[in-house]
């Protein structure tokens, strides 16, 4: 959200006030009883006592929840805000210190000599100027990594929506009595808080959740608001108000790596070197703004600290790393279809670990009723038993809505389990299912009711749930049970939804067996794996978009990720199916799914069967490597599928690569995005050993840090083992579920 008109001017609709200097600083205790720093930054310089009248100030609090992490809370007016709060995990061993070197002021409070107020936690500090021009500097190991300069922070009124003061007196020295006696009708305007942090030369920005726009975010406007917009626009299912800033170094001691996490669940807007090309600006509506600076030795170190700060990742069970096969969405399927597909995979010697039933396991117009459509599945208990005897896990589709035709609608409405309009009527619309109502997950009784419906399915034999949707949540004219601000509850809704589902899975299956297959996400959702990339399109461009979105998501605090192999929308041509199969089975989680087309390989061609068999077996055989890497990634709080620069931080060439990636520490994967098999990929310096290859290809490529161009059949792609690393394999494994540590 831009407030300025170029470099010099503000947009006419905004009244912008900035801290000009820090008038006072003091040491306080934070909520954990640790030392914190509080300052009062005034909107004009204090040169005499008269300057203390008719001006505002920002109260700034600096605190530390964990080592090398500093939180900043900016407050204009104190408000009793009902915006939901993300979970912040504090470290008991953190011991921040506060140092205040006061400036010198004269008898009227005017600054004569500047001072500093500093909070330090481990290797990170924030230093705020006192009694001089406002500046706030963040230093890691005594090196400045970013700063908030004069006029960066701001308290902003949108005077097109109202005014607390007559416009003629805004910024004037009119007395309070004169203001109160004014005959102008005053309406509270929309108010925003803003911060801008410096960007050093050659600093690249990543993150913000799953975004399908260019991988490096410099130059972009990013709005943090969950939307169901597919994979082909700037909208995102998984918005995370966090960015990773990286300035490549020439060695491990010279790079700069830090993250910025804006701890606001309501929509937040970022201008990434766009409104001001030397800064990242972020803002949110309201009277306060809280953010955290997270510093580290490396980009992986920063991501790990952010991951742990917001709850840490959970490890999904081994069977989830195998192949998932779906009924697809709008296809015609029944018990007969399902068994035909499963038997077809067996006959063709293709390992299968999970079978997924999409929406129409329930009757249309009744999602969700949590009951099998007996016309298509007359004996669901028997069907689930037969699937389990084939050593398959079963996933079924759900969403957090109850359609009006569902038998559950009347009960939910009567008992107050749905989000309401402000007038008390149930909030409904016809988008998706007719008369959709939203489960109100802020109501504990509604959560228990919803979980009980899922519990019955788990007792029947269902193993996990695809938690679809969670983005289209009302932001206006909406009332939540706990009084949550709808603007903040919108993004937070997916957390409560997936938390409820994950909890019942843990209760019934145990934590080691709990897994969801989720589309939407917010801060902290990494606790509820796995997430998939949403509704992509069946073409090579969308395949590339999917990878780019995944890498963006995985540089935002998440560990595991999947996508619809072959694309979701439209029909998939055989060549795309085969290329995407390679890519999909070299992701952390692998699922065939579509909209109007089945995704079993023999419906494409016989070579598709061969490709699916080869790469599914390869992934199963790599389970010792994949699962050990998954455990390590969870422990460190880093992604399993990761962009190249996370592993090669001293190689500047890796920082823009978004068409290849590392799968764990050892494996480099370069998917092929065309029918012909032409691929161009970059190998960092060293020797790289092929794991698969076409006939005639050399086993090892030695790179000086250079690009290579090759042509591959559908049975091969650039898949290399890094020099000095290994990939543990077990060729005796038949399925991922067979893997035991």
Question: What are the functions of these language-model segments?
Answer:
Residues 83-107, 420, 691-716:
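Solvent-exposed beta-strand/loop surfaces of large extracellular or lumenal domains
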Residues 502-515, 521-532, 545-549, 553-563, ...:
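Catalytic core of carbohydrate-active enzymes
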Residues 324-327, 331-347, 386-401, 448, ...:
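Gly/Pro-rich turn-and-neighbor structural signature
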Residues 79-81, 249-251, 267-270, 329-333, ...:
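Flexible loop/turn segments at secondary-structure boundaries
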Residues 314-484:
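Aromatic-lined carbohydrate-binding/catalytic grooves of carbohydrate-active enzymes
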Residues 69-70, 118, 125, 135, ...:
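Beta-sheet entry/capping signal
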Residues 2-48, 54-115:
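A low-complexity, Ser/Thr/Gly/Pro-enriched, surface-exposed linker/loop concept
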Residues 1-4, 52, 77, 97-316, ...:
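Catalytic and substrate-binding clefts that recognize carbohydrates or anionic sugar/phosphate headgroups
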């Amino acid at each position: 959200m831009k407030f300025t008109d170029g470099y010099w001017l503000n947009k006419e609709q905004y009244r912008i006030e900035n801290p000009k200097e820090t008038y006072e600083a003091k040491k306080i205790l934070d909520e954990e009883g640790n030392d914190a720093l509080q300052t009062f930054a005034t909107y004009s310089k204090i040169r005499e006592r008269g300057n203390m009248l008719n001006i505002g100030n920002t109260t700034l609090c600096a605190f530390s929840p964990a080592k090398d992490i500093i939180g900043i809370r900016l407050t204009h007016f104190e408000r009793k805000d009902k915006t939901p709060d993300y979970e912040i995990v504090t470290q008991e061993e953190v011991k921040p210190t506060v140092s205040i070197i006061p400036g010198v002021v004269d008898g009227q409070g005017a600054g004569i000599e500047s001072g500093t107020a500093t909070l330090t936690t481990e290797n990170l500090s924030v230093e705020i100027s006192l009694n001089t021009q406002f500046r706030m500097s963040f230093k890691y190991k005594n090196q400045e990594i970013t700063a908030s300069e004069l006029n960066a922070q701001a308290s902003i009124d949108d005077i097109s929506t109202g005014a607390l003061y007559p416009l003629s007196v805004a910024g004037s020295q009119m007395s309070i009595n004169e203001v109160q006696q004014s005959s102008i009708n005053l309406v509270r305007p929309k108010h925003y808080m803003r911060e801008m942090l410096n960007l050093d030369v050659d600093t690249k920005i990543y993150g913000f959740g799953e975004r399908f726009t260019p991988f490096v975010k410099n130059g972009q406007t990013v709005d943090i608001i969950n939307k169901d917009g597919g994979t082909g626009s700037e909208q995102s299912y998984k918005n995370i108000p966090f960015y990773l800033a990286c300035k490549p170094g020439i060695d491990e001691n010279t790079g700069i790596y830090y993250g910025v996490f804006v701890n606001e669940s309501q929509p937040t807007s970022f201008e990434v070197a766009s409104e001001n090309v030397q800064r990242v600006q972020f803002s949110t509506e309201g009277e306060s703004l809280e953010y955290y600076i997270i510093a580290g030795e490396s980009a992986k170190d920063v991501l790990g600290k952010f991951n742990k700060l917001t709850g840490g990742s959970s490890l999904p069970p081994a069977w989830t790393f195998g192949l998932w096969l779906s009924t697809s969405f709008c296809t015609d399927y029944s018990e007969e279809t399902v068994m035909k597909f499963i038997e077809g995979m067996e006959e063709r010697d293709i390992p299968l670990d999970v079978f997924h039933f999409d929406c129409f396991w329930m009757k249309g117009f009744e999602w969700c009723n949590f009951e099998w459509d007996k016309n298509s599945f007359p004996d669901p208990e028997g069907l689930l038993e037969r699937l389990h005897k084939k050593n398959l896990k079963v996933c079924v589709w759900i969403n957090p809505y109850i359609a009006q035709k569902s038998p559950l609608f009347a009960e939910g409405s009567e008992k107050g389990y749905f989000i309401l309009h402000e007038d008390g009527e149930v909030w409904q619309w016809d988008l998706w299912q007719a008369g959709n109502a939203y489960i109100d997950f802020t109501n504990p009784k509604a959560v228990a009711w919803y979980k009980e419906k899922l519990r019955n399915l788990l007792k029947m034999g269902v193993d996990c749930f695809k938690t679809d949707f969670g983005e289209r949540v009302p932001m206006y004219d909406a009332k939540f049970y706990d009084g949550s601000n709808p603007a903040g509850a919108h993004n937070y809704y997916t957390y409560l939804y997936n938390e409820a589902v994950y909890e019942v899975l843990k209760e019934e299956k145990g934590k080691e067996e709990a897994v969801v297959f989720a589309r939407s996400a917010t801060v902290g959702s990494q606790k509820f794996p796995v997430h998939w990339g949403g509704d992509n399109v069946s073409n090579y461009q969308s395949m590339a978009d999917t990878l780019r979105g995944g890498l963006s998501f995985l540089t935002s605090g998440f560990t595991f990720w999947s996508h619809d192999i072959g694309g979701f929308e439209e029909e998939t041509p055989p060549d795309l199916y085969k290329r995407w199969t390679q890519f999909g089975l070299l992701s952390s989680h692998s699922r065939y799914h579509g909209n109007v087309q089945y995704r079993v390989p023999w419906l494409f061609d016989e070579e598709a069967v061969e490709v699916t068999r080869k790469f599914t077996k390869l992934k199963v055989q790599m389970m010792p490597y994949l699962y050990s890497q998954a455990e390590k990634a969870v422990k460190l709080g880093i992604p399993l599928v990761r962009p190249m620069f996370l592993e090669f931080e001293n190689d500047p060439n890796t920082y823009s690569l978004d068409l290849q990636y590392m799968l764990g520490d050892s494996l480099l994967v370069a998917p092929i995005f065309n029918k012909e098999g032409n691929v161009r990929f970059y190998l960092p310096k060293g020797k790289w050993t092929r794991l698969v290859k076409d006939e005639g290809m050399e086993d090892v490529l030695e790179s000086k840090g250079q690009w290579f161009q090759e042509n591959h059949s559908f049975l091969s792609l650039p898949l290399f083992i890094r020099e000095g690393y290994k990939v543990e394999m077990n060729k005796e494994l038949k399925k991922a579920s067979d893997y035991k540590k």
